[in-house]
Amino acid sequence: MNGESKRIVLGVQYDGTPWQGWQTQLNGLTVQDRLEFALSKFTLQTVSTVCAGRTDAGVHGLEQVVHFDTTLERDMSSWVRGVNTFLPPSIAVRWATEVAHNPDEQDNFHARFSARSRMYQYVLYNNPVRSPLLEGKAGWVFRKLDVERMRTAAQHLLGEHDFSTFRSVQCQAKSPVKSMYSIKIEQRGDLIMFTLHANAFLHHMVRNIVGSLIYVGNGAQQPDWLKELLDGRDRKFAAPTFMPDGLYLAKIDYDPKWQLPQLEVQNFLWS
């Protein structure tokens, strides 16, 4: 049964390996295209989605947050099970909830603009020999990395800065100034996990930061080099953009007033 328009929010998880990123493209080979196709099949309506953060080709989503408007009346469990019926194995809706929505008001939930912060994780395999089992799921560096040196270097990035050095030339963000709340670097055996938490990220920002930290970790640069890069605000002096394979959109933070589900989301390589 159909009724008034309502706003539904989904928590979506996906393996980015087979997809050309999140944002819709003419070829239809994106996560957004496939999700909207599944939603349209389930609702028998045309559905347009808005996400919290657009990921590039090969980048994974542990918990992407998406909203859309619909007049369809369904309970939340039906949204999860029904939409997943039309999704491929590499994409799944993990949860669904309805948020208060008044088209005549400005203070409505928005997956992107209501987000207070984002968290990304980068998983790196540090071993002389690559692992075929981690292909597409973790980046790879064969030279031994010094985690303590990288931790020292990362401290220069904390706080509010102009991150122009770490943005791509295609970045469309209005301002390069972002607030980095924390950077955590952990090691378990041959795996190194970088966890970056900021109010927002520029295009390629995480991959560019990780690439530059690797230069510090392998001894090619000193930890203070990160401060020089930050102050220089020139992309060409930083390390090349690192591979997308190990990058995960891990968590989006919202005001508790929206009452979104708070699920424990762990990177399967780190659990």
Swiss-Prot record:
| Enzyme class (EC, first level) | isomerase
Q: Does the keyword Transmembrane apply?
A: no
Q: Which Gene3D superfamilies does the UniProt entry name for this protein? A: Pseudouridine synthase I, catalytic domain, C-terminal subdomain, Pseudouridine synthase I, catalytic domain, N-terminal subdomain
Gene Ontology process terms (BP)? tRNA pseudouridine synthesis
Reaction equation(s) it catalyzes: uridine(38/39/40) in tRNA = pseudouridine(38/39/40) in tRNA
- Catalytic residues at 56
Question: Which GO MF terms does the UniProt record name?
Answer: RNA binding; tRNA pseudouridine(38-40) synthase activity
Please name the CDD domains in this protein's record: PseudoU_synth_EcTruA
Q: Does the keyword section mention Transcription?
A: no
Keywords attached to this entry: Isomerase, tRNA processing
- Which residues hold substrate? 120
User: Known SUPFAM superfamilies for this protein?
Assistant: Pseudouridine synthase (SSF55120)
Pfam families in UniProt: PseudoU_synth_1 (PF01416)
Q: What is its EC number?
A: 5.4.99.12
What superkingdom does the record give? Bacteria
Subunit annotation: Homodimer.
Q: Write out the function statement from the record.
A: Formation of pseudouridine at positions 38, 39 and 40 in the anticodon stem and loop of transfer RNAs.
Query: What protein name applies here?
Result: tRNA pseudouridine synthase A
